[in-house]
Amino acid sequence: MNPPSGPRTQEPSCVATPASPSRWDGYRSSTSSLDQPLPISPTAARAQAAAWIPFPTVDVPDHAHYTLGTVILLVGLTGILGNLMVIYTFCRSRGLRTPANMFIINLAVSDFFMSFTQAPVFFASSLHKRWLFGEAGCEFYAFCGALFGITSMITLMAIALDRYLVITHPLATIGVVSKRRAALVLLGVWLYALAWSLPPFFGWSAYVPEGLLTSCSWDYMSFTPSVRAYTMLLFCFVFFLPLLVIVYCYIFIFRAIRETGQALQTFRACEGGGRSPRQRQRLQREWKMAKIELLVILLFVLSWAPYSIVALMAFAGYAHVLTPYMNSVPAVIAKASAIHNPIIYAITHPKYRMAIAQHLPCLGVLLGVSGQHTGPYASYRSTHRSTLSSQASDLSWISGRRRQASLGSESEVGWMDTEAAAVWGAAQQVSGRFPCSQGLEDREAKAPVRPQGREAETPGQAMTMAMAPWDTPANCELPLHPGWAFH
């Protein structure tokens, strides 16, 4: 007669013990089944579960875990190194430390932390084919993914609004956009993202494992009123609303660029009756720079679109048709949004490429950028050349603005003239070198000008000091929009 056997222990690859029934019940259907052990005490049961696997597993081939783990590792390394390079280059280069570029730096910071907090954990869990870091680790992992993902989306909306205001309302932004105001906007961005990332900690939805159960996210699979309400509000206020704002801004941005392109086509130079090669190059450059940010935004939205579709399918009641692969693959694609920013700037941003060649010469060689003409002196000249070109272009724009202001109230006219004089005073210093602008300047000189106070003199003097004789273009130029200088 065989002696009675003791309590059976479970192999690690077969155990699936949810940590909290209220949170993990929705995932039990996709986990492996357990053999029924002999009765043991509750204390021993808890110790046995903690000693093995405290989270459920899913029955899929090993190569599925390894493939996703390899992809997320490559994405994470690219995101960490690439965004660190963006942060370092923008902070070290004096010509790139502008209020507008603070938004780009913030985007790189959020993308860096997205890669730093998500990729290593996802990779380690994929190698072990199960979640390794317990319930608290799952909640923190999902919280970081939500916080940094929302921050990136709202930062892209702020970038679009900044471009919209500078390009379509250039005079209204003179002296308004500063580093302090940009910092306040970014503080609001982080607080907004934090406000939408904290509710799952307080019972409104939850942070739970997803897909192959090697990563975590908010609970979009449950069909409870609380979870569905959080999912819908989250998509409305952190995805669809920012996306609508971005679309609105870029519609008007490209309208302004198109109108200027049409003006270039009808413009004739002083001698010869055609456009100079430099005019065509400037127009092409402004088009390219306006498209850089749009490309970043489009890739970000496309990266998150599959994940959004999956979550909305679950919201609509079709969670039962979603497989673990359909949950995990879109999550990996969404996390890959963190690598687009540094890649696009390394390929298309001219000042960023020059700064890389200056501060990171080895990478400059790989990018095909020579550091020979990227020293501080060259950067100084390039910055002031852009400033001078921008001020000279204000000649035509201020004329139209003054005529519009004359139709408004007295207070509006005074404010517009004060702002315009700041740029007008600087532009007059070089007007003699722009023959095409001379006629416009003469006409403006004949018009009555409202007396200006000290407020208008100080910005004009500051802009005049920023100019240098070698920065003045010698050929005739068509003024372009003053807000189109990419910072």
Swiss-Prot record:
Keyword Cell membrane on entry: yes
Region span, Disordered: 1-37, 436-459
Stretches that traverse the bilayer: 68-88, 103-123, 140-160, 184-204, 234-254, 292-312, 328-348
Keywords, alphabetical: Biological rhythms, Cell membrane, Cell projection, Chromophore, Disulfide bond, G-protein coupled receptor, Membrane, Photoreceptor protein, Receptor, Retinal protein, Sensory transduction, Transducer, Transmembrane, Transmembrane helix
Ranges per topology, Extracellular: 1-67, 124-139, 205-233, 313-327
GO cellular component, one term: membrane
Record carries keyword Disulfide bond: yes
Pfam families: 7tm_1
SUPFAM superfamilies: Family A G protein-coupled receptor-like (SSF81321)
Gene Ontology terms: biological process: cellular response to light stimulus; G protein-coupled receptor signaling pathway; hyaloid vascular plexus regression; optokinetic behavior; phototransduction; regulation of circadian rhythm; rhythmic process; visual perception
Subcellular localization(s) per the UniProt record: Cell membrane; Cell projection, Axon; Cell projection, Dendrite; Perikaryon
One MF annotation (Gene Ontology) recorded for this entry: 11-cis retinal binding
Membrane topology: Multi-pass membrane protein
Modified residues (N6-(retinylidene)lysine): 335
Family matches, as InterPro entries: GPCR_opsins, GPCR_Rhodpsn, GPCR_Rhodpsn_7TM, Opsin, Retinal_BS
Expression (tissue specificity): Eye. Expression is restricted within the ganglion cell layer.
Chief place where the protein resides: membrane
Disulfide bonds: 138-216
Residue spans, topological domain Cytoplasmic: 89-102, 161-183, 255-291, 349-487
Function: Photoreceptor that binds cis-retinaldehydes. Contributes to pupillar reflex, photoentrainment and other non-image forming responses to light. May be involved in the optokinetic visual tracking response. May be involved in the regulation of retinal hyaloid vessel growth and regression.
UniProt family annotation: Belongs to the G-protein coupled receptor 1 family. Opsin subfamily.
Name of the protein this chain belongs to: Melanopsin
Lineage: Eukaryota, Metazoa, Chordata, Craniata, Vertebrata
